[in-house]
């Protein structure tokens, strides 16, 4: 999903353009069929689309891999995807969270190194209060929505 509608302030200023991806399931095999080539094609298309649309932020929300312990090939494919994505849209912030198919500790593995590159990965919820971010609440013409406390990126 790509959020491609411009959000405008009362002064007509653009606020943010956001890409939201989820359930990539990299490394998935379907009925013993290896989907690596198909996944590579789709990930390349996502990179091309991001380069064209230049989002401010990219959120990859869970199920990055299909297994908690992904194959080396799946990890390499995702690494190549994120590298290409960052090269195509260097100004974009990339945020990733683990899903139920991912290993939270593995997602957290290089968290501190990636922070320096404007890449945020969260596997486990933060343990310290200062690592949490504020509650997100929206109140607009469409109604009120309270998203509760979210984890820090």
Task: State what each model feature region is.
Residues 93-95, 120:
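Proline-centered loop/turn at the N-terminus of a beta-strand
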Residues 2-83, 87-91:
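N-terminal active-site segment of His-dependent metallophosphoesterases
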Residues 37-38, 74-76, 98-101, 143-145:
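A short linear-motif detector with a strong N-terminal bias
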Residues 70, 101-153:
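His/Asp/Glu-rich metal-coordinating catalytic cores
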Residues 64-67, 96-100:
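Conserved short loop/turn motifs at secondary-structure junctions
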């Amino acid at each position: 999903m790509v959020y491609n509608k411009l959000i405008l302030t009362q002064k007509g200023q653009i606020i943010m353009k956001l890409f939201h991806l989820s359930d990539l399931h990299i490394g998935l095999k379907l009925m013993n069929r290896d989907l690596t080539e198909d996944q590579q094609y789709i990930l390349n298309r996502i990179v091309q689309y991001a380069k064209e649309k230049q989002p401010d932020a990219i959120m990859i929300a869970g199920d990055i891999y299909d297994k908690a312990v992904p194959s080396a090939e799946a990890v390499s494919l995702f690494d190549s995807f994120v590298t290409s994505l960052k090269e195509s849209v260097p100004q974009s912030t990339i945020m990733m969270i683990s899903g139920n198919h991912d290993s939270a500790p593995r997602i957290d593995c290089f968290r501190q190194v990636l922070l320096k590159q404007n890449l945020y990965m969260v596997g486990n919820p933060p343990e310290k209060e200062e690592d949490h971010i504020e509650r997100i609440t929206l109140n607009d013409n469409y109604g009120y929505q309270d998203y509760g406390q979210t984890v820090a990126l």
